C-alpha cells in the first residue's frame, strides 16, 4: 500500500524553527513531505525563508494525507487570515487523519473549538485562555501532548513535538525514538550510537 504524504501548512510569518526536526526525520524515514499555503502562493517565514508550495491549502483533502502539520506564526494572533487553516484541521480530525499543531497554531485550533474536548498543551495556559475557548480544563503542563489524532506543543519544544509525531506515525520504533529524543533534546552523546543502530543507519 502506498504511503500518503505528510502535509506541512505554511503561511507568512511561519516559525521556521518549529517543524524542522519533524519534517527532516519523517523524510529520513521515507515519508514524502509536501507543503501547502493559502491560495498556493509563495510565503515567507519569520526568518526570511521564502517557500514555494506544492499545492494550495484549499485543495488539501484529508483522504490524500497521513498528517497535517501546523506551525506557529505571528499571523495566528493578528486576525482571522489563518482561520481557514484551522478549519482544514477540523476536516482532518473529523476524518480521523492526524493533526499536529505547535505554538500559535494551538490558539487557532482553540478558536475553532478543537481543543475543548481534547487534552492539549501550548505556550502557556493563559495564552490559550485569552482565546475564550472552553477547553481550559483539558490543558496539560507538558512539553508536548498527544490525544488521539491530535498533537500539540509549545514554541520552545520542537524536539518533543517531533517525538510525538514520529511516534504517532510509527516512523521509527519506540527504542529508536527514545534514543533520538535523548540525542536531540538532552544532548546525550551515548544516544547517537543507539539512535543510528535502532534506526538502521
Per-range role (PLM):
Residues 39-43:
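Short active-site-proximal "capping" loops at secondary-structure junctions
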Residues 14-19, 44:
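Short N-terminal binding/cap micro-motifs at the start of the first secondary-structure element
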Residues 2-14, 24-38, 54-100, 104-201:
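Active-site-adjacent pocket-lining segments in enzyme domains
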Amino acid at each position: 500500500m502506498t504511503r500518503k504524504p505528510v502535509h506541512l501548512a505554511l503561511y507568512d510569518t511561519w516559525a521556521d524553527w518549529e517543524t524542522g526536526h519533524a519534517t527532516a526525520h519523517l523524510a529520513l524515514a521515507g515519508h514524502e513531505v509536501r507543503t501547502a499555503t493559502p491560495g498556493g502562493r509563495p510565503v515567507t517565514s519569520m526568518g526570511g525563508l521564502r517557500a514555494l508550495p506544492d499545492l494550495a491549502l484549499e485543495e488539501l483533502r484529508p483522504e490524500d494525507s497521513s498528517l497535517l502539520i501546523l506551525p506557529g506564526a505571528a499571523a495566528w494572533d493578528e486576525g482571522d487570515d489563518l482561520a481557514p487553516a484551522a478549519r482544514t484541521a477540523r476536516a482532518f480530525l473529523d476524518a480521523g487523519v492526524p493533526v499536529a499543531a505547535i505554538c500559535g497554531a494551538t490558539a487557532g485550533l482553540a478558536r475553532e473549538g478543537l481543543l475543548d474536548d481534547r487534552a492539549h498543551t501550548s505556550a502557556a495556559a493563559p495564552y490559550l485562555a485569552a482565546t475564550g475557548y472552553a477547553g481550559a480544563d483539558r490543558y496539560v503542563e507538558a512539553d508536548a501532548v498527544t490525544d488521539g489524532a491530535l498533537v500539540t506543543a509549545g514554541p520552545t519544544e520542537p524536539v518533543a513535538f517531533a517525538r510525538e509525531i514520529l511516534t504517532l506515525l510509527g516512523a521509527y520504533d519506540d527504542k529508536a525514538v527514545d534514543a533520538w529524543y535523548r540525542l536531540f533534546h538532552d544532548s546525550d552523546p551515548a544516544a547517537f550510537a543507539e539512535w543510528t543502530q535502532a534506526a538502521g543507519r
